[in-house]
Amino acid sequence: MMEQKDRYIRFDWAVKRLLRNKANFGVLEGFLTVLLGEPIRIVEILESEGNQLNETDKFNRVDIKARNSKDEIIIVEVQNTREIYYLERILFGVAKAITEHIELGQLYSEVKKVYSISILYFDIGRGTDYLYHGQNSFVGVHTGDFLEVSTKEKNAIVRKLPAEIFPEYFLIRVNEF
């Protein structure tokens, strides 16, 4: 009799083989739409090592690139093996995605927010949940209040929380399902 673990298709296998076809993007878009709570469209499925510009450039192991209705960037990575400094690597990946999507001479207001979603098939650390969300905010050291940034745009004051600008991270620990 076949073992229970052998009966299911792994998500990483499906992404790399079945869902690579544009006709099947609906499955991935549905997954991302539910996770992020808004409509998501897949832009492309990437070859993980194919986004390296030259041999000295670090590559970003992104498997899926998508966008939301605000044209923000979503990068999805399926990671099978444990890696030392994994959090530093996803930080690098987000930074690279940001810099790849702004041209010299563009205003910083054109920088797109990035969502990093890591589907992990290894134990990254201690915790009881299978889904973790990380986001940046600036909290007053003495008051505990959240900083709201104000900028003047077109004769109007625009207020934004840093969480609306800085990247968001999702870590999905598959082995904890």
Write out the residue ranges for each language-model feature.
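Elongated, amphipathic alpha-helical interaction scaffolds
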Residues: 1-177
